[in-house]
């Protein structure tokens, strides 16, 4: 049995979606980020940077959502793709660029509007560029790394925030197709609902 330490965030949803995709039983221990529970000493013992998600399985604890996805893909033998190098590239693009930049956009536009015109404009433009880059890539690709994989599972929860990104999907037809196809997967529907 797996234990997922999470809150209702895109990074945590990656893991609940993956656990649903591989049909594994798991429990969720909610860490309330708004109350600062991630900074409690007990939690810092399993997450040195005070971040969620964290996954506990048997005698090991894994932190960082990308590392957890790779662990679960290796554990299950699923969703790492036929070309693991390509899958890893797209997973790392999500971990190092897509997620952090959309997260910054969210901070400036949703939590702190009007505090920094420079920040709002910068991250809005970056968010638009991310949407366009993904749309361009998906013109010739059904999924990010060829077949449905942990790269898509990692990226989907961030694009699912498109209504609050104030960008929308209307002008990104390939990204919309990709998003709608993944959104219909039963495991995604169940796993997204943390």
Language-model-detected regions and their locations in the chain:
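GST-like fold's C-terminal all-alpha helical module
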Residues: 97-186, 191
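Short linear loop/turn motifs
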Residues: 87, 193-194
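GST-like domain detector, emphasizing the conserved glutathione-binding G-site
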Residues: 1-121, 135
């Amino acid at each position: 049995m797996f234990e997922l330490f999470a809150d209702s965030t895109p990074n945590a949803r990656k893991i609940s979606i993956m656990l649903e995709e591989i049909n594994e039983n798991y429990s969720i221990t909610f860490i309330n980020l708004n109350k600062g529970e991630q900074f409690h000493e007990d939690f810092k013992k399993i997450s040195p940077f005070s971040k969620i998600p964290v996954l506990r399985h048997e005698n090991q604890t894994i932190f960082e959502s990308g590392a957890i996805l790779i662990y679960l893909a290796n554990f299950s033998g699923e969703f790492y793709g036929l070309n693991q190098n390509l899958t890893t590239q797209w997973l790392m693009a999500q971990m190092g660029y897509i997620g952090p930049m959309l997260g910054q956009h969210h901070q400036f536009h949703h939590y702190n509007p009007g505090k920094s015109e420079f920040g709002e404009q910068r991250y809005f433009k970056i968010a638009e560029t991310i949407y366009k880059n993904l749309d361009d890539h998906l013109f010739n690709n059904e999924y990010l790394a060829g077949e449905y994989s942990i790269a898509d599972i990692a990226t989907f929860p961030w694009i699912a925030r498109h209504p609050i990104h104030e960008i929308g999907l209307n002008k990104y037809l390939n990204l919309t197709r990709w998003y709608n196809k993944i959104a219909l997967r039963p495991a995604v529907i169940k796993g997204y609902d943390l």
